Amino acid sequence: VVTYHEETETFKIIDIKTSTNGWNDYAKKDENKQFQLLLYKQYFSEQYGIPLDKIEIEFFILKRKVLDADDENLMSPYQAYRVQQFIPPSGKIKLGRAKTAINDFINECFKSNGEIKESSYPKSPSKWNCNFCPYKEDKENCGEGISY
């Protein structure tokens, strides 16, 4: 979602995400999530000729599960809110790191003519990597047979 504030002449790019219970500190520090929104800011600036300092970014997180006020797992009244907002850092250094990350990915995965590079990528099984892998239960294609 992109909004425009006429008085300050600034744009805000809002990335709406869903989460079971909201984002913890680990999710907020996930650079891949931050880089996605930072790159939206960069490309929006390039496409429409808007200075970067006139573009703000924000995550708007919708919680799928909200605890009741009398739930014993409720640690704070703020935990019961259905939405959560997070504004990641978006200065020049962070934006530069996002651009470097996407360019490194493109250079590693694609040839200069746009074709996919054929390469061998070593398996790196871990709780996080295997959790999202489509082959996590496919011992024939994975070969690791690791289940978390």
Where are each of the predicted segments found?
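Metal-dependent nuclease catalytic regions and adjoining charged, substrate-binding loops involved
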Residues: Q42-Y148
